Every structure is written in C-alpha cells, then in structure tokens.
Design a protein with these regions (language model features):
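Active-site-adjacent structural elements that line small-molecule/cofactor binding pockets in enzymes
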Residues: 1-300
Length: 300
C-alpha cells in the first residue's frame, strides 16, 4: 500500500491498546467494535510473552468492518519471517487491506522470557525483512500488498523504517522524539507514534497512576531508557517509576483539552497519525476515556 494511501486510510487519530489480548474474546470484540464506532482510524496492540498478535488481529478484524487493525508490534522472535509474511497476506486479503503489520525486535527481557536469544536488533530486523521479501506464499495475495511499519526509536532503525517499510511506529516517546523521527524519515514515510493518555487532573493522583500503570514497567527496558537518554533524561529520571518530569513528558494527563494539546504537539512535530493509549486504571479497558476524547480528537 502506498505510504500516502496508508496515512489516508488510518486517519490522524487511532487507539493503542495493551489489554485486548488479556480479556475474553467477546469482551475484546465489543471493545473493538465500539472503538470503530467512535471514529478512531486504527486499532494498534502489542505482543507480550503471554499473547500472540496474529490470532488477536484476526479476532479484531472479524469484529469490525472499517477500522484498520495494526500490530504495534509483532515481535520478530516469536515467528519466523515466512510465517509473518503469510499471516500478513492472509489477513490483508481477507479483510480488504485493513491489516497493517508492525514489526519490531522487542526487548531482551521479553525475548528471553520466550526462550529465545536476543541479538543485535538492527541487524536482526534487517535480516527478517530480507527473509520476508524472499518468502514463498501460495494463498490469495492482497492487492495492494499489506503495509508494514517498524518499531523504531533510534536513528538507524528509523532509517531502516524509511528505506524498507511504509514508516515507523515509535512507542513510549515524546513530541520531541517525533520531530527527530520526522527529520530522519523525511516527508514520505508514515510516522505514527503512540501516546499514553490519562483523564485525571490532580497532579499527584495522575502521576501515581501513570507510574503504576505505565512508566514503571517500561523504564525497566533498556531500549526505552536508551532512547530517553538521547532526549535528555538520565538515571535520576528513571528511578522510582519515573521523575515527575519524565512522567509528564510520556503521559498526557489532565482534562480532555490537555490531551488534545499533546496530540497536536505530535502532529505539529510531523506525526501523520497518533495512537492514543488510554491507561485503564479502572479495569474497564479505558473505553470511557476514549468516549470522552473522541469528539475532541476526531471531530474537533
């Protein structure tokens, strides 16, 4: 799928959700259908040591009619390149091109938990793309071919996303990173960062919830802290689940307008699409927050 067509298809606002693989299928289907009904253009989700992205993508595609479903990301260590190529072709052909294959090298602790050996991520992703391009496939072919994007944080992975994929899907980033990413990608490739959001206006409460439900976990992963160091953060920001400065930079908390401003900062920095991740502090999958935000982010 041409890059401009992909950006047009998914629109300017999507949803990133980490909980859809951890609930009964019926609950995930209802959530996906409502996210589509609210008008979000894409539904992104990750892959953990306890979930599998391709089967979840099929479930979400079957539950919806228009929204693009995107792996954000599928871990390259979980399945070989031929399997990823076949899965992407199958899903894109069966669901009218609504599937986007987001790929990434994940993180050493998560790869090790699956019994694999983590290797140099840039070389590993490049070799994986080579193998995908050479992989045979005997089923019906999607036309246009399924789009693929890369989880890219550092300059060299962003260059690979520019040269070998439709674009980049950075996670756990700031608008400053989005600006740097756009500079490397250039004008054409898709840039679709994730942005965590939390509708809570009390600073102490918001930061506490953000640490509990988001930053504390990700600050244990060296790829993210390495990227944050490039953005000017240091060890003092990584302790205790994140300094106030770091939490405020990573999580857009406050009222609806505060979230709108942060999303606009990403767009102003060069993002084509921003995937908001509602921090589900109430065990309700954050759907209530998505309902409140949709009229402002999508229609506003």
């Amino acid at each position: 799928m041409p890059q401009h067509a992909l950006a047009s298809r998914i629109g300017r606002i999507g949803v990133w959700h980490g909980g859809l693989g951890q609930v009964p299928g019926a609950v995930a289907r209802r959530a996906a259908a409502e996210i589509e009904q609210l008008g979000y253009g894409a539904l992104w989700f990750g892959e953990t040591p306890a979930t599998e992205s391709m089967s979840l993508a099929g479930l979400l595609l079957a539950a919806t009619e228009r929204i693009t479903v995107a792996t954000g990301i599928a871990n390259i260590w979980v399945r070989d390149a031929s399997a990823a190529h076949a899965a992407a072709q199958t899903l894109a052909e069966a669901y009218d091109g609504r599937f986007v294959l987001g790929l990434g090298a994940s993180h050493a602790p998560l790869v090790d938990a699956r019994g694999h050996r983590y290797a140099k991520p840039l070389a590993a992703v490049r070799a994986y793309l080579d193998a995908m391009d050479a992989a045979p496939y005997e089923g019906p072919v999607a036309d246009p071919p399924p789009a693929r994007v890369l989880a890219a944080l550092g300059p060299k992975m962003l260059e690979l996303a520019r040269d070998r994929a439709a674009g980049a899907h950075p996670y756990f980033v700031t608008p400053e990173h989005t600006a740097r990413a756009r500079e490397i990608l250039g004008a054409g490739p898709l840039l679709a960062p994730e942005q965590a959001v939390l509708l809570e206006s009390d600073p102490a409460t918001a930061r506490s919830l953000a640490r509990e439900h988001h930053t504390r976990f990700y600050l244990e992963l060296p790829n993210y802290t390495g990227n944050l160091r490039r953005l000017g953060f240091g060890d003092e920001d990584f302790a205790g689940g994140g300094s106030d400065r770091l939490v405020d930079a990573i999580v857009a908390w406050g009222d609806v307008d505060a979230v709108r401003r942060r999303v606009q900062e990403h767009h102003d920095a060069g993002a084509d699409h921003v995937a908001i991740q509602p921090l589900a502090t109430d065990r309700g999958l954050g759907i209530g927050q998505l309902r409140e935000l949709a009229p402002v982010l999508i229609d506003g």
